[in-house]
Curated annotation (Swiss-Prot):
Function, as annotated: Recognizes and hydrolyzes the peptide bond at the C-terminal Gly of ubiquitin. Involved in the processing of poly-ubiquitin precursors as well as that of ubiquitinated proteins.
Molecular function terms, GO-annotated: cysteine-type deubiquitinase activity
EC number(s) from the headed UniProt entry: 3.4.19.12
Keywords assigned by UniProt, alphabetized: Hydrolase, Protease, Thiol protease, Ubl conjugation pathway
EC class: hydrolase
Protein name: Ubiquitin carboxyl-terminal hydrolase 8
Species classification: Eukaryota, Viridiplantae, Streptophyta, Embryophyta, Tracheophyta
Amino acid sequence: MNGTSPDESPDSTTQRIDSFNGEQRVYFVPLRWWKDAQDSMPSESVEKREILYTASCGSSYGGPMKLINNIFNSDILFDLRREGDALQNGETGEASVSGRDFALVSSDMWLQALKWYHDDKNTEKGVKSFSAGGVDRGDVYPVQLRLSVLQETNSLAVKICKKDNSVECFRRACKIFSLDSEQLRIWDISGQTTLFFESDVSNSKDCQQQADQEILLELQIYGLSDSIKLKESKKEDGSTQQTNGITNGMNGGTVFRFGRSNSLSFLGKAGEAGTLGLTGLQNLGNTCFMNSSLQCLAHTPKLVDFFLGEYSKEINLDNPLGMKGEIALAFGDLLRSLWAPGASTVAPRTFKAKLARFAPQFSGFNQHDSQELLAFLLDGLHEDLNRVKNKPYVEAKDGDGRPDAEVADEYWRNHVARNDSIIVDVCQGQYKSTLVCPICKKVSVMFDPFMYLSLPLPCTSMRTMDLTVMSADGSSLPIPLTVNVPKFGKFEDLHKALVTACSLPEEETLLVTEVYNNRIIRFLEEPTDSLTLIRDGDKLVVYRLKKDANNSPLIVYMHQKLEEQFISGKSSPTWKAFGIPLVSRLCDVENGSDVENLYLKLLSSFKMPTEFFTENLENPTEEEATDKTDTDGTTSVEDTNSTDVKETTESLPDPVLRLYLTDDRGNSIEAEMLKEKPVNKSKRLNVLARWPVKELDVYDTCLLSSLPEVSKSGTKRPQESVSLFKCLEAFLTEEPLGPDDMWYCPGCKEHRQAIKKLDLWRLPEILVIHLKRFSYSRFMKNKLEAYVDFPLDNLDLSSYISYKNGQTTYRYMLYAISNHYGSMGGGHYTAYVHHGGDRWYDFDDSHVHQISQEKIKTSAAYVLFYKRLVD
């Protein structure tokens, strides 16, 4: 479209038009000026339908428009509308004339109007009518449309058949952008306006399009007052550079130009800039974990190109491992919504519903792990988009001494024969797994694919624990002990550390227990249980026991003493638990008398000297006063089901020590242990000792009651730091398999705890790195807060690749981070995304704002997304 000033002479304009090699042109003219020119026309030459369209400024430009050539030089955006829809007011048919309204006229009409306007006289020359109506031409030349969303993404080619008409082209455009047809208009700007549709059933005139024609597509986002526009700011050397940013206050739609050009033009007022893809996701209720992963994937370059194209052609509806394409379609629709012009915030309800349907673990509104969602989504997208319709059977063969390169290529060919999708193309790599049998030294080499690397954090591998060690023969007092164990180790690691710390002789063994409220609540006997089951506030007691060839059962002694409590002014004697339980074996115990003698032997180390005991009769111990404030483990005398308790209280102050059979918690009394009564030695014996006041005074109960916590609460440790390369080296370090993950050795024909070694073999285009900050157990979850120092612009992995298989580069650039703040279960997820130039953005659910590059490296980094650099 060309424009000239209304004040120019018709002759000069004619000469200018002739210089365009005879091509027909369409002109924007100000509507006020056009109305004045119409007034000068002869009435028989004026037809209302000669003004086919109007053009209203779609940007926020509000200045005067005096000269047409100045208008076009300012890169102002216009919306085109039919005259009948936009210009007529009511039944009068009068046009509403505005200083910002324009008419779209043919070159013949433009020349005649200039003459009438300048000469102010009638002309004899007929006016050529210009209309979009007429006979439909149903054929077009073969044409290729190039669609692009941002300059940093590759353009998308859309093939249109020669038999396709303009209606089919219109429908194709609607399908590509997932828009309703009434929200879209197409017209030809190749030299003469011949195609103009407001619905997919409109007819067109003069559809003989040229092969190099350019189709302009306008997308109008209804219900929104703001659009996102981009402009190409001109450099001094004449080249263009795209500027990114968010611009508010612009009305109307965003115009995209599709044609043979590889670049995408976004027209807007000078100084206005914006960008696509900076769209937040609403938090539907603890869905920040999902939003974080989705934003990282939605800004993965190759995936953006793929899902903005005709990806539905690759959906595999028959894959039994897939989800009938529903996850891929839901993700594709969501990604298009995030990249739609004018979008501000998107509510991912449809996607979450699909997710909950196929992955019930993510249903509801509980907090989950963003990496677990990412793993499920990548696997689900792969299966939904798997190009392999019928997977062939392939057998995994061992290397058997063949060259690694040959075996690796064989494994990869077998993998791709069954798994071929955009996810495999972009996100999957391959590592080498070597297993060595510790017995026969058999070596097995396999090559497995990976979607992401889960790296441990080696700097936080040790944990300090405080415990109390008790003798099982009364030979020594309780001993406090501190040991260092692997933070994610097992109970057997704790046992080994205790054996070393105690210098344990061969004839002794250790029993590790957890004590709470003066009773043993747990025996830590399973060697494969995780040490994460032990919390910092727990109290652990270790008993040194003699090894017994007959494996005699244990006998556990719990203690109670009688206290006077005053309730509502009345005295109420109550039994109160105190002290650490004492443990021994039943190997030399036959009757009740032996049970009592063994108990007194275990207490012998707590007996105070005679002179201290005499002095203490006149001055009550501090421990007695302290015990009165502790009400845990109390039993009312009146509530007990022992018939001897009342006799005991009535015979004060001269009672005797009594022993009772009880349960493992010391809550109920089964029977009193009589001295001559035989003891059942077939199972563990739980004994409750009830002490008379006078006899208890001869023992130092303070030593019996003091227990340290595993780790003192409130002590703040300095934050640890580690480099990403150290994490990678820990991942690649040789280590033995666990007892629950043993390998079947083909040489020994037995399951063995083989030595395993991993090596990187083939790296993907998109490298996803998962930092293993979280550990899970049956009872608790832990998070590591260590700061991981990772490179931004140049992650060079060339020194970690076992085989250089012709790949040009092993360098990567960071483009997204999934962050987790806070503790497990109550934390919050966000995403940092690199989006054009050197800009980083913080995606915090529906809030999106720019963040400086210096602030993106934090201890909250959880999943890192890298893209391969091209040399």
